[in-house]
Amino acid sequence: MNGFSHFNEEGRARMVDISDKSSTVRTAAAISSVHMKHDVYSRIKNREIGKGDVLAVAQVAGIMAAKQTSAIIPMCHPLSLSSVDISFGWEEKDSEAVLHIQASVKTKGSTGVEMEALTSASVCALTVYDMCKALDKGMVIGPTCLMEKTGGKNGDFKRDASEYKVEDQS
């Protein structure tokens, strides 16, 4: 059926059987970003946002999101994660400030952690938006993409950082 593994012979959704796959160390790193006004950037940096420390809350939200990925993405397997690490970097431009987010996830298991890394980076960005939306509803999230993955039978993947005009944060 189309070469998609998440469909059975009748074309209906199914969770892929991974019981025969070997358990190996698998990693993934995903990035996202939040584009905002300079005033919002300044208030985040100076911890002047009424809801609290934006980056600390976003970091915890990203970790929690990675752990809950299988609960919100239907065909994802629940995984025992070895680690989740979130890092932030700022870029100041003439017209805006950009918060760069990288989520790195690791497991030892039978399936990869790409979706956990993507979910983590996305939820970090959404949390920043939620905490700052009173100041700037025009914030833009993205791009969000997988930057790198290791382990598994399909081998490693590393995105050229210039492919989507994203900053290399690895």
UniProtKB/Swiss-Prot annotation:
Binding locations of substrate: M75, C76, H77, M115, E116
Annotated SUPFAM superfamilies: Molybdenum cofactor biosynthesis protein C, MoaC
GO MF annotation list: cyclic pyranopterin monophosphate synthase activity
UniProt catalytic activity: (8S)-3',8-cyclo-7,8-dihydroguanosine 5'-triphosphate = cyclic pyranopterin phosphate + diphosphate
Protein keywords: Lyase, Molybdenum cofactor biosynthesis
Recorded family membership: Belongs to the MoaC family.
Oligomeric form and interacting partners: Homohexamer; trimer of dimers.
Protein name: Cyclic pyranopterin monophosphate synthase
Organism encoding this protein: Bacillus velezensis (strain DSM 23117 / BGSC 10A6 / LMG 26770 / FZB42) (Bacillus amyloliquefaciens subsp. plantarum)
